[in-house]
């Protein structure tokens, strides 16, 4: 019995360690206008050891998907990306016109100055899953290059594993 408890504790601590090797910065959600049912969330994600973003969830939206926008000829196309690779030591930018998180079936308007809870669902190179809880500010535009680190930081709330 003690061996099973120890094994479970080690497994939980290993997923906690993975989530701690993922850093999120410059996160923001685009504000909406009345009646708008979808918006985007944007951020920079850096994984020290590599892994994958396998999903995103939030109580603020009924559907959350990672999407990629890409030019095909002279037409901009948007497609769902079920998994987003997070190469070791590299920063992956989720930004307007590229990879981003689509928030659809919004439960309420996204008002400038408010914060939205987001949960990143991550997977390490060994296939272990973890989550990273964020509180993301709502803005009308992308954060400026001169924004203070506190303005650009999304926060790393409590991790749930």
Report residues per predicted region.
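Compact, glycine-rich, soluble single-domain proteins
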Residues: 21-161
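Bacterial N-terminal signal peptides that target proteins for export
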Residues: 1-7
């Amino acid at each position: 019995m003690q061996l099973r408890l120890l094994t479970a504790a080690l497994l939980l601590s290993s997923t906690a360690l993975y989530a701690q090797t993922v850093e999120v910065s410059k996160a923001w959600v685009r504000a909406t206008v009345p009646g708008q049912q979808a918006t985007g969330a944007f951020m920079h994600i850096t994984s020290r050891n590599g892994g994958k973003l396998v999903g995103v969830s939030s109580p603020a939206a009924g559907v959350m998907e990672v999407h990629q926008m890409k030019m095909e000829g002279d037409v901009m196309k948007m497609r769902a990306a079920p998994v987003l690779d997070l190469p070791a030591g590299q920063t992956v930018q989720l930004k307007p016109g590229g990879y981003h998180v689509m928030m659809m079936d919004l439960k309420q308007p996204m008002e400038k100055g408010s914060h939205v809870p987001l949960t990143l669902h991550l997977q390490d190179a060994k296939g272990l899953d973890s989550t990273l809880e964020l509180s993301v500010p709502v803005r009308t535009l992308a954060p400026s290059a001169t924004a203070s680190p506190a303005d650009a930081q999304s926060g790393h709330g409590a991790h749930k594993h």
